[in-house]
């Protein structure tokens, strides 16, 4: 898939995703998502106790 396809597919999600939403999109557990964040495979920002993932960064990861 290319960027446009993912953008269309994910248009109903907000621009900044929670870890639950990102895990749902990737079809992985939250633990697997956190491992990808720790390994710097996915860029995320920790706000309080929760990670936030910019949707465009998630799409970049999916395309690469």
Residue ranges and their predicted role:
Residues 1-25, 31, 35, 55-64:
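Basic Lys/Arg-rich amphipathic helical interaction modules
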Residues 26-52:
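Major-groove DNA-recognition helix of helix-turn-helix-type DNA-binding domains
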